[in-house]
């Protein structure tokens, strides 16, 4: 894990030093019909780490289904906390595969992706796609040490009236996690 992070940082530094780096070309290659070209572009973006997150987040919002799929997969593989908000937003994507990859990415982030997810549930608890994706993520995360914090949110997601019960359960879970300092109590909402 440490070697992966160091490699991503080194690649990010070398790319940021180059003027006019071909990052946009890599994003464009995510829509290629050529599987090998698309996978190579995604791997290059993942190797960039945090530096690729803003462009991937934009591709996740504006690209076609294939581009959004690749962007969601790349953001999940990068796994930095900055990738969580766009992945949370992708839980509402029209394509099931994109929503699934966003959930898998958030599960892989563990607690790093939890705060933006809980915020989204507080603000948009009426979104069916968001609740379905959140259920997938929270169900997996509640299997570990986060169970006592997330079990009420999971119960609310499975409730007869989740649109009413989920925002409050998410608020209380976030409040408990902040009190235990498991998540920071400052969070910048970005969309």
Model regions and ranges:
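Terminal, non-catalytic domain-edge segments
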Residues: 180-191
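Buried hydrophobic core positions in alpha-solenoid tandem helical repeats
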Residues: 25-27, 55-57, 86-88, 116-121, ...
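Helix-adjacent hinge/juxtasegments
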Residues: 94-98
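Structural detector for internal amphipathic alpha-helices that build alpha-solenoid repeat scaffolds
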Residues: 2-20, 28, 35-50, 55-61, ...
């Amino acid at each position: 894990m440490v070697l992966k992070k160091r490699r991503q940082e080194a690649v990010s530094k070398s790319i940021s030093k180059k003027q006019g780096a071909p990052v946009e070309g890599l994003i464009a290659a995510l829509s290629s019909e050529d599987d090998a070209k698309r996978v190579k572009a995604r791997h290059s973006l993942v190797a960039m780490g945090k530096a690729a997150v803003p462009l991937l987040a934009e591709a996740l919002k504006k690209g076609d289904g294939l581009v959004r799929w690749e962007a969601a997969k790349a953001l999940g593989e990068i796994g930095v906390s900055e990738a969580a908000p766009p992945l949370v937003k992708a839980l509402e994507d029209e394509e099931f595969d994109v929503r699934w990859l966003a959930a898998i990415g958030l599960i892989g982030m563990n607690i790093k992706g939890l705060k933006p997810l809980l915020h989204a549930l507080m603000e948009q608890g009426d979104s069916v796609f968001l609740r379905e994706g959140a259920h997938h993520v929270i169900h997996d995360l509640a299997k570990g040490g986060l169970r006592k914090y997330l079990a009420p949110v999971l119960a609310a997601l499975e409730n007869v009236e989740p649109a009413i019960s989920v925002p409050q359960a998410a608020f209380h879970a976030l409040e408990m996690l902040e009190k235990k300092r498991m998540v920071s109590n400052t969070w910048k909402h970005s969309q």
